[in-house]
Swiss-Prot record:
Membrane-topology descriptor: Multi-pass membrane protein
Chain's role: May form an ATP-driven capsule polysaccharide export apparatus, in association with the BexA, BexC and BexD proteins.
GO function terms (MF aspect): ABC-type transporter activity
Protein name: Capsule polysaccharide export inner-membrane protein BexB
Designated gene of the protein: bexB
């Protein structure tokens, strides 16, 4: 193919795949290095954090306060919340860390954001699968009731993480101070993510307010898949899908608008 020739959709897709793969490898090496366990930190990092939380709940004997398996309760809420929180935090620095690469005509601003969010989602997903499998094998938690329903919930929340990451990155690009305080703001959002409560246990008025937050629907859905009919959940798949698509569309528009003013350095 000669320079300047138009590419087919298949060729463009192949080029895009190579760009994302190269950015992923660069991000992994830059963040984790080539020595020791290297890229394995990608999922070891979230796994260790989740392990710490689970052990804390285990040794304070949280099961004394509920008939529900509290380790399973934590595992079906906290890791998912950390996925979208970490993804949005990492998205903020994606452009500044890759400015020099924007000289390449096939590398776009959107690619750098997508790569970082994809890395966080992949790491959180691997850690979640491994840790839940280990906990089931050592009989600390029961096997999930509906794995497929859980996978759908996780996928929809991964979409939420991408959309949120695009929006947060776009805002931080326009207002530098926002990028510095988002880490704190996202931490404050954790209590309303649904990670630490069931909507069913809230007062009726609080339930109606809580169900306006998309991440609560994702958590409720994930827990419904794990616990089955032993718990009462209030997820709306339709609301979560519409919210994800709205965030993605808004995020893409915002990134497109500010990308025009980003100059390689």
């Amino acid at each position: 193919m000669q320079y300047g020739d138009k590419t087919t959709f298949k060729q463009s897709l192949a080029i895009q795949g190579r760009v994302i793969n190269a950015l992923l490898m660069r991000e992994i090496i830059t963040r984790y290095g080539r020595q020791n366990i290297g890229f394995f930190w990608l999922f070891v990092e979230p796994l260790l954090m989740t392990f710490f939380i689970v052990m804390m709940w285990k040794f304070i004997r949280a099961d004394k306060f509920s008939t529900l398996n509290m380790i399973a309760f934590v595992m079906t809420g906290y890791p998912m919340a950390m996925m979208w929180r970490n993804a949005s935090n990492r998205a903020i620095g994606s452009i500044s860390a890759n400015l020099s690469l924007l000289y390449h005509r096939n590398v776009r601003v959107l690619d750098t954001i997508f790569t970082r969010v994809l890395l966080e989602v992949a790491g959180a997903s691997i850690a979640q699968i491994l840790f839940m499998a280990i906990l089931v094998m050592i009989d600390w938690i029961d096997a999930p009731h509906d794995v497929f329903y859980m996978l759908i919930a996780w996928f929809l929340m991964a979409m939420f993480a991408f959309g949120l990451g695009l929006i947060i990155c776009a805002i931080a690009q326009q207002f530098d101070v926002f990028g510095k305080i988002w880490g704190t703001l996202s931490f404050v959002l954790l209590p309303i993510s649904g990670a630490f409560f069931f909507v069913h246990n809230l007062p009726a008025q609080a339930q109606s307010i809580a169900l306006w937050f998309p991440m609560i629907h994702g958590t409720e859905m994930f827990r419904h898949g794990y616990f089955g009919d032993t718990v009462v959940t209030y997820e709306s798949i339709g609301f979560l899908v519409v919210s994800d698509l709205a965030l993605l569309l808004l995020g893409l528009v915002m990134v497109k608008n500010f990308s025009k003013g980003v100059e390689p350095q």
